[in-house]
Amino acid sequence: MLPLEKAFASPRSSPAPPDLPTPGSAAGVQQEEPETIPERTPADLEFSRLRFREFVYQEAAGPHQTLARLHELCRQWLMPEARSKEQMLELLVLEQFLGILPDKVRPWVVAQYPESCKKAASLVEGLADVLEEPGMLLGSPAGSSSILSDGVYERHMDPLLLPGELASPSQALGAGEIPAPSETPWLSPDPLFLEQRRVREAKTEEDGPANTEQKLKSFPEDPQHLGEWGHLDPAEENLKSYRKLLLWGYQLSQPDAASRLDTEELRLVERDPQGSSLPEGGRRQESAGCACEEAAPAGVLPELPTEAPPGDALADPPSGTTEEEEEQPGKAPDPQDPQDAESDSATGSQRQSVIQQPAPDRGTAKLGTKRPHPEDGDGQSLEGVSSSGDSAGLEAGQGPGADEPGLSRGKPYACGECGEAFAWLSHLMEHHSSHGGRKRYACQGCWKTFHFSLALAEHQKTHEKEKSYALGGARGPQPSTREAQAGARAGGPPESVEGEAPPAPPEAQR
């Protein structure tokens, strides 16, 4: 038997057996390793997946660097050191499932960040129940459309989340800007689908006109107040013109003045071929004017008589009638007017009696201002008849010519610039145009101006009348002498033409 000391010393000197790992201890070590890896949120997981899927070849310097970068991005997404093979397969299947969802469902399901395929399927089923579209569960890209179910589908390669929808704190890690997804068609160009599309387009074109008519009928009409100023009725335009005339101070007392405005301009150039609307003296005056124009060429001044014949005092017409005829050359008696009809039915003897009445103010009213002749070298000037509107208005009111048809109503239209009065509104409008620089025709005998060439021709016939009185019978029988002879046979003085100017006295010429 060994001593006690030796017995206690032997175990102390013997080497201790090595500690072998037990199965329980190994499992504890494996359970402690995942706890050291930080947990990642679903948003971070989706962001790492997008970085791997959206990586492009141009971001690396070469093919080897590209492969190394892809390995690194794939490890950041799948994390093989922290997940098992089953977990990594779950991520790949989930990605494929979310990529083939319909467009109307996929953004909402991806925004929920499903962690497993079962959770993603339950989200799609719940959304289909809410939208009441059971056809969505068939997995058709267009929902419950039966037309698209016959086609061949392609995998959608766009990212599952748009950059604006991915709200992750790891976006600021400098991974680079994610490009916007491009629109990729779900359906490949299948011949059957193209044929069905052509049939639908043909039906749409056939139904196009009917739909267009319905749209036009249902479209509200434009309010009329937008374009009513551009499309006024003629009656409204006439009413506006009438109001303007009233604002200017014109008195439209004649009911037929508006209808005569259009016809009086035509009467200036168109005369009655039969001469029924003109007096006999007017027709004789035309023949006398022709003889005057043939005898005296243009530019030659007719000689004025130095002494007035004794018969001129009786043949002198009223001065008011002369001025009225010169200012209104286009006026002719209207056959529809009862007063004009009465004047046409008057006999020549009645007109001669009117002409024979002496004008009380003839001596003073007919003395006009002197206008110098531009070709006179010694300053001599021929006497002209004054064309001022005041003297014309006074003479028209004093002379018996104011009793003629058309003048019995007075002269309500007066010019605001010169005060000259007119019986017709159209004559006043023509007179207004003369103040605006309208061309005037001047008589070379007395230098009196007229607005119309016809009025100048009528005025030149009066000078021919005066010339025939001065020459007497030296030049043979003239139209004026024949008129005088015809008047003598009728029992009265020779008929004078309205608008004739008497010769001036000799002392006025000096």
Curated annotation (Swiss-Prot):
It comes from the Eukaryota. The gene is ZSCAN18. It comes from Homo sapiens. This is Zinc finger and SCAN domain-containing protein 18. Residues 288-299, 491-501 have a biased composition (Low complexity). Residues 49-131 form the SCAN box domain. One of its GO terms (cellular component) is nucleus. It is found in: Nucleus. May be involved in transcriptional regulation. Residues 214-231, 263-273 have a biased composition (Basic and acidic residues). A zinc finger (C2H2-type) spans 413-435, 441-463. Residues 344-356 have a biased composition (Polar residues).
